[in-house]
Amino acid sequence: EALYDICFRTLKLVTPTFGDLNHLISATMSGVTCCLRFPGQLNSDLRKLAVNLIPFPRLHFFMVGFAPLTSRGSQQYRALTVPELTQQMWDAKNMMCAADPRHGRYLTASAMFRGKMSTKEVDEQLINVQNKNSSYFVEWIPNNVKSSVCDIPPVGLKMACTFIGNSSSIQEMFRRDATSLTAMFRRKAFLHWYTWEGMDEMEFTEEESNMNDLVSEYQQYQDASAEPXXEQEEDYEEA
C-alpha cells in the first residue's frame, strides 16, 4: 500500500509495475547493508543496528524510508544537500510502511547516509531534527538516533539516505490487521484451509490476543514518561 502511494503521488507513475516496487525495495535494502559492503567514515553493522534499534525484544518492527525517491532509469541532475536529504528522510511520504509516524513517537531511529559528506554536518542536522520535533521522540531514551556514513553513493545518485525507525505508530498496521482477523475469524472465513492442515482454532485466538497485546505494549511505551523515575529517586534520597 505504501509503495503504491509512493509510485502514484511522489514518482507520478500512472501504472506502477512490480519492477517499480522492487526498485524501491532494493534501493532501501542496499542502503541498509551498504556499510557491510563498502568503506565509510562512520560505519555500522547489523549487530549494532539491532542493539540500537530494539529497546525491548517484542518491539522489533521497523519503518523504513529512503531519500531521494527516484523512479527506475531516472538520472538525478542536481545533488541534494544534507539538510534536504534529512528533511525528506523524516517525511511521512517517504516511509515504505502504511503508518503515519506523526501519529506516534519514535523509540529509536537510524539514518544511513551514502556519498561524500561531512559527518559533523550529518550529526548537526539530526540533532536539529530532534530538537525541533522533540514531541515525536520518547524522552526516556536519550540520544536515540544513530547515524552512519558510507563514502560510496548508489548508482545514479551523488548522495542518498536510508532511514530505519522504531516508531509506536506502527501499531496502526497491527490494529488494521487485528480488525480484519477478528471480522474474518468470527465468520470462520477460510478457516477450513488451515484446520485441514492440522491447525487448531485456538491458535488463531491466541494470535489475536498476541497482536492486541503488542498494540498495547507499543501504546504503553509511547505514553511512558521519564518523570516518575525522577520522583522515585527523590523519594529514595529523602528516605
Swiss-Prot record:
Purpose: Tubulin is the major constituent of microtubules, a cylinder consisting of laterally associated linear protofilaments composed of alpha- and beta-tubulin heterodimers. Microtubules grow by the addition of GTP-tubulin dimers to the microtubule end, where a stabilizing cap forms. Below the cap, tubulin dimers are in GDP-bound state, owing to GTPase activity of alpha-tubulin.
Record bears the keyword NADP: no
Protein name per Swiss-Prot or TrEMBL: Tubulin beta-3 chain
Any one GO biological process: microtubule-based process
Residue span of region Disordered: 207-239
GO cellular component: cytoplasm; microtubule
UniProt binding sites for GTP: N22
Pfam families in the record: Tubulin_C
Intracellular or extracellular location(s): Cytoplasm, Cytoskeleton
Keywords: Cytoplasm, Cytoskeleton, GTP-binding, Microtubule, Nucleotide-binding
A single GO molecular function term of this UniProt record: structural constituent of cytoskeleton
Domain of life according to the entry: Eukaryota
Biased composition (Acidic residues): 230-239
